């Protein structure tokens, strides 16, 4: 069981801004810090804030980092993942409040949205089909193949 999960956006906007390099560097720095058994790194689909990419979300505290650069990765690993101190200068500013960091879903951009196609973005690993199946993926296909007729 990992104590932290780092989600790196792999959507088109973030990829064009260098998220693949971010992910590679992040994995290297986590290994250097000896955290590979404590911190998982997962590439996700698009979160919808492409202009802020590359973006990264660190759980369990849901810290939302935006416009992350490769040069920022050692600081994120050392400060946030190793010492538990959020790197506030990299946080998406709308998530920063006097009471602390608010969840991304509570920001103006997200709070009126009802995600359908991307509802599992950041919840499941898109590269692990068992996680998709575990959230009901392919249930409609199963119903069509086992319960319905061509006339249905």
Question: Predicted regions: what is each one?
Answer:
Residues 1-152:
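Feature of Fe-S/electron-transfer and energy-metabolism proteins
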């Amino acid at each position: 069981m990992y104590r932290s999960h780092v989600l790196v956006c792999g959507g088109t906007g973030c990829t064009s801004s260098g998220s693949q390099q971010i992910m590679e560097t992040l994995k290297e720095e986590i290994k250097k810090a000896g955290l590979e058994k404590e911190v998982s790194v997962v590439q996700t689909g698009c979160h919808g804030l492409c202009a802020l990419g590359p973006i990264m979300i660190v759980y369990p505290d849901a810290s939302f980092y935006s416009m992350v650069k490769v040069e920022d990765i050692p600081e994120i690993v050392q400060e946030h993942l190793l010492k538990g101190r959020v790197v506030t200068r990299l946080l998406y500013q709308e998530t920063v409040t006097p009471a602390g960091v608010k969840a991304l879903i509570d920001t103006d951009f997200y709070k009126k949205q009802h995600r359908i196609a991307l509802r599992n973005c950041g919840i499941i690993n898109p590269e692990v089909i068992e996680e998709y199946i575990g959230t009901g993926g392919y249930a409609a296909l199963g119903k069509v193949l086992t319960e319905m007729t061509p006339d249905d």
